[in-house]
Each structure stands twice: as C-alpha cells, then as structure tokens.
C-alpha cells in the first residue's frame, strides 16, 4: 500500500487544497465530485474521489449488530446486486453490541434500485436500521 501524508491549511471558506502529488496519484481533476464522510466522535474526515455520475451515487447509513460476519452480510447484498462500494466507514458503537457503518455506493451498474437494496438489507438479522440518501452535489 502506497501512502502519502501531508499537513494542509483550511482557508477562510473552509476549503483545503489537495497536494498535487495526491491529485495526480488519485486522478483527481478540477470539477470532479468528492465524497466526504465526517466522523464527529473520532474528529476525522475521509475524502474520496467519485468517478461516476452523481445521480448514481447513494449513501447507506446502517446500524448493525456488532458481531463477526455482520459487515460481510451487508456487503454480500451490495455485491449480489452489482452495487459498487466507493467508500465506507464502520465503527463499533458498543463493542459486541452495535456498530455504525456509512457506505457510499455507485448504483450505475446495479440490477436493482437503491430502495430494493435497502429493503433487502433491512431483512438481514444483523441489521438494526438502514437509512438511505441519494448523494447530491452541493456546490
């Protein structure tokens, strides 16, 4: 795994500049959409490039039973329907009891719509709650 780390400054409008070496390595172009996941508990932000049309991108926000195989069951449903995971962030809320996952998915090649996948996820015994949101550009 190749990594590059850097310290960047936030400007007065809340923007950061992604270093050129990172933009080139990840293929980030001007005008490209980026998925942003903020974890308030860990005080961290994950930024991932989106290489598909924004109308095909959805966010699944799930609460799961925190046990081995829970995440595999969720990703199995996504894979079965050819929903491509762009980025994901999962954390244990209460170890051995509950976990939270945010999964951003490209639905452009999926054989079903996002609501169908949401219903299938809700039927899994390891899923406590599923919230679905269409990823929208804001700027």
List each language-model region with its residue ranges.
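Regulatory modules associated with amino-acid/nitrogen control
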Residues: 1-60, 70-75, 130-139
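A conserved regulatory-domain signal marking ACT and ACT-like small-molecule sensing domains
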Residues: 50-139
